[in-house]
Amino acid sequence: MTEYESSSEEVKREYEDQIAKHGRITNMKRTLLHNVPAFKAYMEWYTLYDQLVPVIGDRAISLFSHAISEGNECLICSIFFRKILIDSGDDPDNPHLSDTEKLLVDFGGAICKDPHNIPDEISNTLSARFS
């Protein structure tokens, strides 16, 4: 893991930015800071998040992201989004989903199964709902 005191100025700026924006820096992010371009690529998730909040809301983003994390069998990612859901009062094992949230969860699962072959029902419903 990257230690702040022994880091370059560029790494220190990224480290400080994380603390300012999120109050802390996770071990995974500290590890990624060994390579600033890799860290920045990972952090683009937050850019996407900020763009999607006005369209689908925080909860839907967390459910969608959790579905993708589960589908990819990414334990760290699954735990991250699971914690967000639990902290917001949801039960990730038995969420009560709106039609839009169900569609996004199904889409997340389909992306993991075969991103080049999303079922027509999901694709058509997404197009109708978000076009």
State the predicted function of each range.
Residues L32, Y46, L63-I68, L104-C112:
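Short alpha-helical scaffolding segments that buttress acidic/His motifs in well-ordered protein cores
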Residues S123-L126:
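Alpha-helical bundle/repeat cores within regulatory domains of eukaryotic proteins
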